[in-house]
Amino acid sequence: MTGQHQNRVHSQLDNVALADFLYGLPAVSRPIIREWFRSGHDVEWKADDSPVTMADKSVELALREALAAQFPDDDILGEEHADQRGTSGYGWVIDPIDGTRAFICGRPVFGTLIGLVRDGVPLAGFIDMPMVDECYVACLLYTSDAADEGHCV
């Protein structure tokens, strides 16, 4: 999705293509999360006393690669790695494991969060709950059904 197609996906006219792209991201993040979940792992502590694991770092890197491959001119900001600045005016914000403490304790109540913004205005949101197989996507004025059983967002 580069060039003209990239711009079309960013437009209001192609929310479906953007939602389809976002619904494909669990294929990137879930295998990593499931590999690390309840496997025992070292925990590091950030300056704000929040925990971070190798799973957090690995998931964020994989999602950054997927986003950069499709949207190379966009900003990518995350919790665990340096910001990547682009020129498109669009930006992706990643929280690879929201609920790291639950993840560390082996509780399946955490998720991967991604947002798309332009000039500070939210355009799309993604919530994936990998251990319960639920993924939710919302794009601009379009809301999609949950991927699991059609529960409305």
Where are these regions (language model features)?
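N-terminal subdomain of lithium-sensitive/metallo-dependent phosphomonoesterases centered on the IMPase/IPPase/PAP
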Residues: 1-97
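Conserved small/polar residues in nucleotide/adenosyl-binding loops
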Residues: 142-150
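DPxDG-like acidic metal-binding loop motif
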Residues: 87-140
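Single, functionally critical "micro-switch" positions that shape active/binding sites
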Residues: 55, 128, 147
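Intrinsically disordered, low-complexity segments enriched in small/polar residues
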Residues: 69, 134, 149-150
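Ser/Thr-centric signal marking residues that sit
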Residues: 53, 100, 143
